[in-house]
Each structure stands twice: as C-alpha cells, then as structure tokens.
C-alpha cells in the first residue's frame, strides 16, 4: 500500500524561543523530524511531504529532506519527498488577510496545503514531537483497511505523559467510547502543578492523568480535503478570519465533523512514550531520551 507521511513544520516555535523544528537534539545533531521519517519508512510509508514556509525549503532539504530521499522502503524503492508551502498563495482569491497577519493559519490550513500532492492514505504529525516507533506501525496498519470516505484514525496518548514542568501546553482532550473518538476539545493552557495535579488553567478544571489526548498524530484518506476546504473557508468568512492571530485547528475541525456525524475516528494506542519540546527547557530531557534509544538499539548509531 502506498501511504504518505505529512509533517507540519511551518509553525513558529514562539513558546520554545526559536525554531524548534530545526533544532538538532539527537546525539549526532539529528532533528526530531528525522526520527519521524525514519520510523515511518520502516513502518511502510513511502512518501514524505514537508509543510513549510517557502523560505525554509533550502534549510529543510539540508536538515531532513536529503536524509528522507536517501532512505529506501522495505522493497528497495526510494522514498518520494515533496514540499508543500503554507503561505498566502494558498489562500482563496476572494480572501484578504488582515494587515499585520504573519502567523500561519493553523494546522487545518497546513494539511489543506498538501491537497495537490497527496492522493493516498496519509498520516499527519507535528515536526517537533517524537511519537515512537510503534505509533507509525500501528497507524500504517490502520490505514490499510480504513474506508475511503467518512473515516479517520488517531494515535492517543495519556495526558500525564505529555505535560511539562516548564509551562502550559495545548492538547486536544479526547472522549473515547468503544475505541472511537466521540469528542475532542482543544485545551490551550494545561498546566502541571508542583503536586502533580494537572489543570486546565482557563477553566480551573482538574484533568485526570490518564485522560486520552491528541498529539496531532492523525490518519486520513484524501476524502478529508473536501472537508478541510469547507471548514477553512468558513473560518476565513467568520470573525476569526479577520484576526491577526486566530488559527484554524485540525482537532477543532475533527470535533465539528464528529458532532455532525460526518466522520468516524478510530482511536489507536501506541506502546511507546511520546516526548517533545514545547519549551527550550525541555531540550535536555529529550536529548537524554534519544541517547537511550540509540544505546538500546532502537536506532542505529547515526540516522543519516
């Protein structure tokens, strides 16, 4: 089966304090995207699509694109590498962005930007997260049997394993019944308190550590692009479309489609642990975890 890995790498790492997508954190300077690409190809994915800003093309080719192009699938074929640009040229002609808008329009728009490049089942990930080897195998297996219309999948993680002591995080808090997602709420300020309590700072609600959350590890078929276009255009026509900061988010779109009965989402689970770099202070821990994975043979001495 042909399947694509779509990597969202155009976002600005404001909370991290720089461009965390291109920060070499592995023992030989590997960036987190390289681990995602390596794991996906091992799982069976044979195309990689990087969503970037146009001025990132040369940098992305050097940091990860060439590495991806040098990989081979299980049957010895080269991995196809493509680049999708998330910028103003991907906006509809009838829309004029508000003055001062420099921020990307969010993850739903990012995935929509790959429409002309992706014609097979695909997995979407963040560029700055480590999801684990098993997550890609699990998703690839799910995509082999996913219906062409009205169905999707996601890999869920326990909230307690996705928070940081260095500040608040944004997570898609999920409600799951019989293995399917029934609701997802993008919660923007989740804090880990000194006593281990996890709280939504906006509402004061205490969240259970075993709450399933989305880390933007999604599986879709190309039929999702029609839904993405409709949702994004509605966003642009709304008051949010005139904001310089509002974002059109993928989890929010999924939640709306669930509520309308237009999408069924299977919730998958991975045996591996997620980790990532929301803040610069997270970097040392991530680097230590990656060293352990190389030392225990999960990865070769060097990925490149």
Model region roles, listed by residue range:
Residues 60-64, 139, 228, 286:
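Hydrophobic packing residues within well-ordered alpha-helices of enzyme cores
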Residues 229-263:
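A C-terminal functional module that forms or caps the active site or interfaces directly
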Residues 219, 265-268, 276:
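Conserved active-site beta-strand element of glycosyltransferases/polysaccharide synthases
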Residues 1-71, 120:
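N-terminal glycine-rich phosphate-binding loop and ensuing alpha1 helix
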Residues 120-130:
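Short beta-strand-to-loop acidic/aromatic patch adjacent to the donor-nucleotide binding site
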Residues 69-121:
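Short phosphate-binding loop-to-helix
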Residues 133-218, 222:
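Conserved core of the sugar-phosphate nucleotidyltransferase
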């Amino acid at each position: 089966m042909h399947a694509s890995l779509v990597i969202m790498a155009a976002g600005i790492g404001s909370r991290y304090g720089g461009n965390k997508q291109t920060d070499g954190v592995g023992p030989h300077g590997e960036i987190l995207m390289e681990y995602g690409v390596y794991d996906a190809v091992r799982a069976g994915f044979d195309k990689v699509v990087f969503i970037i800003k146009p001025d990132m093309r040369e940098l992305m080719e050097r940091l990860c694109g060439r590495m991806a192009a040098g990989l081979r699938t299980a049957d010895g074929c080269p991995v196809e590498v493509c680049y999708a640009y998330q910028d103003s040229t991907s906006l509809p002609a009838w829309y004029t962005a508000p003055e001062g808008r420099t921020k990307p329009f969010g993850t739903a728009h990012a995935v929509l930007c790959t429409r002309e490049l992706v014609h097979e089942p695909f997995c979407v990930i963040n560029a700055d997260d480590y999801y684990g080897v098993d997550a890609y195998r699990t998703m690839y297996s799910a995509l082999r049997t996913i219906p062409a219309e009205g169905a999707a999948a996601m890999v869920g993680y326990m909230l307690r394993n996705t928070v940081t002591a260095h500040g608040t995080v944004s997570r898609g808090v999920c409600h799951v019944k019989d293995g399917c997602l029934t609701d997802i709420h993008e919660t923007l300020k989740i804090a880990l308190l000194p006593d281990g309590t996890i709280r939504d700072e906006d509402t004061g609600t205490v969240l259970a550590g075993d709450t399933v959350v989305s880390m933007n590890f999604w599986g879709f078929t190309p039929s999702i692009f029609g839904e993405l276009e409709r949702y994004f255009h509605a966003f642009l026509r709304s008051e949010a479309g005139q904001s310089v900061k509002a974002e059109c988010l993928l989890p929010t779109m999924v939640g709306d489609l669930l509520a309308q009965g237009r999408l069924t989402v299977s919730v998958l689970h991975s045996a591996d642990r997620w980790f990532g770099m929301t803040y610069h202070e997270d970097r040392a821990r991530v680097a230590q975890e990656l060293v352990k994975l190389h030392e225990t043979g999960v990865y070769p001495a060097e990925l490149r």
